[in-house]
Regions:
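Short, flexible loop/turn motifs enriched in small residues
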Residues: 6, 42-48, 245-249
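Generic marker of residues within folded, mature protein domains
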Residues: 13, 40, 62, 89-91, ...
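Active-site-adjacent loops and short helices of periplasmic peptidoglycan-processing enzymes
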Residues: 24-194, 198-203
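Bacterial N-terminal signal peptides that target proteins for export
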Residues: 1-7
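Compositionally biased, proline/threonine/alanine/serine-rich low-complexity intrinsically disordered stretches
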Residues: 23-44, 328, 380, 384-391, ...
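C-terminal segment of classical bacterial N-terminal signal peptides
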Residues: 13-20
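Domain-terminus/edge residues, biased toward the C-terminal soluble/receptor-binding domains
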Residues: 170-174, 182-187, 191-399
Length: 399
């Protein structure tokens, strides 16, 4: 059953057919209809693994199987670009650094059936051109050249990708190559792709501007950016498309409207036309139908917890981080919050120690829990207070 929000944001397509080339690669079963039965209109494209994220706070606004690992195809090139961006920030390379196009990169990139930027065997190419090739036209040959140049081999570069994914907390991610070419162990969830995209936007502005470029010319060949949001959705400025027979057509998209950023990820569509339709409608819905609500700021006190045998009787409970909840606008109007902890707390308690949770719930919203910490250090009670407490417990329990 499709969710109500999906039905609300997509229009029915009367006669959308996949391009002939795609149909040839991906044969599909055609239903047989009796002569007197009318053919029903084609359903609107239904993507898989949908994530809509608030790019400002990182709050997930909408999730459809968004935490399940999936084959990302070329969308995983976001991590390839991030590794290059890190090296630039660390001054290990510059945009003018040149890398050699090996036979391996040429044969498995430029001579492959996948996307490439027409690199020539044994040529020397600048990082500036290579990273544009990766970001704008999804060039596999550029990915391999960068991997070999930065790490010595693609396998060593993949180790850097996986290590970086762990550092960023992308728990679903496991990469086996720098290109996104099919491999059953090359996976990441759409939610983690959204987190990766958000990190790129915030920490690599010098590279992020390339994601909005509409075309790239190299070696006499001009290729267009395949991102269907660019030029069609107001404020769209990135990020990356992906497609293999295993993954279908997917998109990591981002746009800014009225000072607010939304990040969209989905996968599993059968054609570029379907990807365009779904991408435009979902991104528009992301701004029109979803919102965020700030519950508390980092360090804000939200309650107190009883303390047993402490230097004070209660511990102030404060938000460990900003607490922001996102979702459909109608759902946010009915939010409820309450504090839970296993009490009384036992001293000593360190300042910043997680001791409780703020529970946020409401009709139509999956219950969310956020850590609360002690706002100050609380030492143990002195011997007199402990003795007095012992006497109190003893006599209060006597009959």
């Amino acid at each position: 059953m499709k969710t109500a929000v999906w039905a609300a944001c997509l229009l029915l397509l009367a006669s959308a057919l996949p391009p002939a080339a795609d149909a040839a690669r991906r044969p599909h079963r055609v239903a047989r209809h009796a002569a007197h039965q009318p053919v029903q209109p084609a359903a609107a494209p239904q993507p898989l693994h949908v994530t809509i994220m608030d790019g400002d706070s990182g709050a997930i606004l909408h999730c459809e199987d968004c935490n399940a690992p999936m084959p990302p195809a070329s969308m995983s090139k976001l991590m390839t670009a991030l590794i290059v961006g890190d090296a630039l920030l660390q001054h290990r390379i510059t945009l003018d650094t040149r890398y050699h196009v090996s036979e391996n990169a040429w044969r498995h990139g430029a001579m492959s059936d996948g996307s490439h930027m027409f690199l020539e065997l044994n040529s020397e190419v600048s990082i500036r051109d290579l990273i544009q090739g990766v970001i704008v036209v999804s060039a596999n040959d550029a990915c391999i050249v960068l991997a070999e140049g930065l790490a010595g081999s693609e396998s060593a570069f993949v180790a850097l990708m996986n290590r970086r994914a762990q550092e960023l907390g992308l728990r679903s991610a496991h990469f086996t190559n720098a290109t996104g070419l099919p491999d059953p162990n090359h996976v990441i969830s759409s939610a983690d792709l959204a987190r990766l995209a958000r990190y790129l936007v915030a920490n690599h502005p010098e590279l992020y501007r390339l994601y909005g470029e509409r075309a790239f010319t190299y070696n006499g060949h001009t290729q267009e950016n395949r991102n269907p949001l660019l030029g069609t959705v107001a404020g769209a400025d990135g990020l990356k498309t992906g497609h293999t027979d295993d993954s279908g057509f997917g998109l990591v998209g981002s746009a800014v409207q009225n000072g607010h950023r939304r990040i969209l990820v989905f996968n599993g569509l059968r054609s570029m036309a379907d990807r365009r339709e779904a991408g435009i409608n979902l991104m528009r819905a992301a701004f029109e139908q979803y919102a965020t609500q700030r519950i508390a700021r980092r360090g804000q006190q939200l309650g107190e917890a009883q303390v047993y045998l402490g230097s004070r009787a209660t511990a102030p409970l404060v938000a460990q981080n900003d607490i922001v909840v996102g979702g459909p606008q109608a759902v946010l109007a009915g939010l409820r919050t309450h504090v839970v902890y296993a009490g009384p707390l036992r001293a000593p308690i360190a300042q910043g120690q997680v001791v409780a949770q703020l529970v946020v719930e409401g009709p139509g919203l999956q219950t969310k829990r956020f850590p609360l910490v002690s706002g100050q250090r609380i030492g143990g009670a002195n011997w007199f207070a402990k003795a007095w407490e012992g006497l109190r417990v003893t006599f209060s329990g006597a009959h």
